[in-house]
């Protein structure tokens, strides 16, 4: 068996095209396009690339992008003041603060200061809570993108055994909630899991999100499983790899995402969707009190 590759780039492009079409229809009706404020602190090379990709996606879809490129010496108080200003600006629909943040800034405080209605990353406790009670609005971008990748396979997800490796607040935990919402039976694995191999060996769906190169061995994969590799790791030779041992896993899985070119593009595409959703929710007055 050789797995079919889930082409995240192609699916992301289709998602961006769909979002652009919806925005174009708004403009035809005399309505405005969404606006996304993107805040970048410092000049970390990876963060700079991520922000550039997000701004390019705004250009593709017709979303207005506001750039706030600040020095990494920006104080927490200054960043919070900017966020509060953007929260009050009715012309701004989404606010994104690129992580990681400098050590002197508390990420939790930043996330919770962004208005839940403008939290297009889907990190705010309010939005995670809505997902937990099966009433999602602004969904965490990477997990939501993974669901779209899974749906692209045409495989019926209802009742499948899904294992999520990693329990981070931004990816692992909301990923488990998304899979529950899709009707899967979900197991979350972490550093205290006693037998990771046994959990993965019985999984119909494996989602890896830990950031450790080749943590998940290819021979652990159940024949016919779907493997989604969210991890992206740079090796000593400069090459990129995921959390899953791809070359062996692809001989056992039915479907698998590559690294790079799998999940990453979908994260950006769902961010654009969320920005449009935030505008529409604001217009329909479905915001939290």
From Swiss-Prot:
Pathway: One-carbon metabolism; tetrahydrofolate interconversion. Its EC number is 1.5.1.5, 3.5.4.9. It comes from the Bacteria. InterPro entries: Aminoacid_DH-like_N_sf, NAD(P)-bd_dom_sf, THF_DH/CycHdrlase, THF_DH/CycHdrlase_cat_dom, THF_DH/CycHdrlase_CS, THF_DH/CycHdrlase_NAD-bd_dom. GO terms for cellular component: cytosol. The keyword Cell division does not apply. Keywords: Amino-acid biosynthesis, Histidine biosynthesis, Hydrolase, Methionine biosynthesis, Multifunctional enzyme, NADP, One-carbon metabolism, Oxidoreductase, Purine biosynthesis. One of its GO terms (biological process) is methionine biosynthetic process. It catalyses: (6R)-5,10-methylene-5,6,7,8-tetrahydrofolate + NADP(+) = (6R)-5,10-methenyltetrahydrofolate + NADPH; (6R)-5,10-methenyltetrahydrofolate + H2O = (6R)-10-formyltetrahydrofolate + H(+). One of its GO terms (molecular function) is methenyltetrahydrofolate cyclohydrolase activity. Coiled coil: none annotated. HAMAP family: THF_DHG_CYH. Belongs to the tetrahydrofolate dehydrogenase/cyclohydrolase family. Homodimer. This is Bifunctional protein FolD.
């Amino acid at each position: 068996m050789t797995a079919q590759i889930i082409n995240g780039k192609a699916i992301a492009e289709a998602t961006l095209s769909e979002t652009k079409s919806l925005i174009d229809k708004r403009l035809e009706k005399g309505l405005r396009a969404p606006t996304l404020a993107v805040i970048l602190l410092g000049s970390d090379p990876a963060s700079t690339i991520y922000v550039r990709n997000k701004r390019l996606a705004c250009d593709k879809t017709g979303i207005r992008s506001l750039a706030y490129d600040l020095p990494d010496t920006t104080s927490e108080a200054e960043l919070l003041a900017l966020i509060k200003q953007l929260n009050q600006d009715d012309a701004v629909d989404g606010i994104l603060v690129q992580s990681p943040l400098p050590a002197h800034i508390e990420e939790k405080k930043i996330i919770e200061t962004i208005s839940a209605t403008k939290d297009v990353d889907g990190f705010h406790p309010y939005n995670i809570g809505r997902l937990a009670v099966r009433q999602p609005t602004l969904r965490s971008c990477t997990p939501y993108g993974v669901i779209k990748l899974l749906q692209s396979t045409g495989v019926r997800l209802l009742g499948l055994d899904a294992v999520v490796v990693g329990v981070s607040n931004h990816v692992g935990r909301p990923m488990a909630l998304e899979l529950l919402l899709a009707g899967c039976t979900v197991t979350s694995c972490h550093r205290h899991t006693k037998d990771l191999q046994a959990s993965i060996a019985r999984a119909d769906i494996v989602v890896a999100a830990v950031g450790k190169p080749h943590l998940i061995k290819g021979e652990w994969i159940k024949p016919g499983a779907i493997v989604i590799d969210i991890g992206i790791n740079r090796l000593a030779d400069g090459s990129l790899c995921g959390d899953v041992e791809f070359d062996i896993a692809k001989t056992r899985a039915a479907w698998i995402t590559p690294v790079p070119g799998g999940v990453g593009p979908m994260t950006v595409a769902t961010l654009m969707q969320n920005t449009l959703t935030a505008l529409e929710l604001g217009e329909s007055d479905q915001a939290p009190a």
